[in-house]
């Protein structure tokens, strides 16, 4: 889990400001597309008699697999040529290896780092125990927060760089549904820093403010939305 101990930074990627670029994923005809009308706000609540860490582990693993699958549908379009940086809006993400060394990489390389690292974690019995009697590590919640942060980067990149391909494949309903479920779960348990998600606040507000999801925009969903995408982020 050394990769989680390193830093992660983001900075403007040199593109024109996001406000000047048309965000196709925000068009009403696309934001209303879902594969279910289920109220995810109810689904994410911790069930009675279920241990919190068990609930976090189960859902985090599920989100990892679903986001990995969603990315795989457009992976052939996400190449070192088309996506030379891991960008979301005007924000560029860098990877830091286990030695804390800054690694500038293409989007597909970044996603591969994320997915391979998370795969190792969720299959590690010392971190994500599945056998009766095994305890979760004391740092488990912080590890889940780190995982969610990187999975959010992947979702954001799909929207920002590959929504048109997702639209052509008619998988935007799946993407929207996954995004809503993921964000509501993360907000329910404070797994994502509002400053981290500010880059996608416009989409979050539209998708998560529908009936049944009205509680999702709390916890600073709109804090920093005004001009937040033009600021350098370091984390």
Curated annotation (Swiss-Prot):
PTM entry text: Phosphorylated.
MF (Gene Ontology): metal ion binding
Stretches for region Disordered: 1-22, 213-235
Protein localization: Nucleus; Cytoplasm, Perinuclear region
Residues reported in the UniProt entry to bind Zn(2+): 78, 83, 157, 162
Pfam families, per database record: Mob1_phocein
SUPFAM superfamilies documented for this protein: Mob1/phocein
Protein role: Stimulates the autophosphorylation and kinase activity of STK38 and STK38L.
Subunit annotation: Binds STK38 and STK38L.
Protein name: MOB kinase activator 2
Gene that this sequence comes from: Mob2
């Amino acid at each position: 889990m050394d990769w989680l101990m390193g830093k992660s930074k983001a900075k403007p990627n040199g593109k024109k400001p996001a406000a000047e670029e048309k965000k196709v994923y925000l068009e009403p005809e696309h934001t209303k597309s879902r594969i279910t009308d289920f109220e995810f706000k109810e689904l994410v609540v911790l069930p009675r008699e279920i241990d919190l860490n068990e609930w976090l582990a189960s859902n985090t693993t599920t989100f990892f697999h679903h986001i990995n699958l969603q990315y795989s549908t457009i992976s052939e379009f996400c190449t070192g040529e088309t996506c030379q940086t891991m960008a979301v809006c005007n924000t560029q993400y860098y990877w830091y290896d286990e030695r804390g060394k800054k690694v500038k990489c293409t989007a597909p390389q970044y996603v591969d780092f994320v997915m391979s690292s998370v795969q190792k974690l969720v299959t590690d019995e010392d971190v994500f125990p599945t056998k009766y009697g095994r305890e979760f590590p004391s740092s488990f919640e912080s590890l889940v927060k780190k995982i969610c942060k990187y999975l959010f980067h992947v979702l954001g990149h799909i929207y920002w760089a590959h929504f048109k391909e997702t639209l052509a494949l008619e998988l935007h309903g799946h993407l929207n549904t996954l995004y809503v479920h993921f964000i509501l779960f993360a907000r329910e348990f404070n797994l994502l820093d509002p400053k981290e998600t500010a880059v996608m606040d416009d989409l979050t507000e539209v998708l998560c403010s529908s009936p049944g999801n009205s509680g999702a925009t709390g916890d600073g969903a709109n804090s920093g939305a005004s001009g937040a995408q033009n600021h350098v982020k370091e984390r």
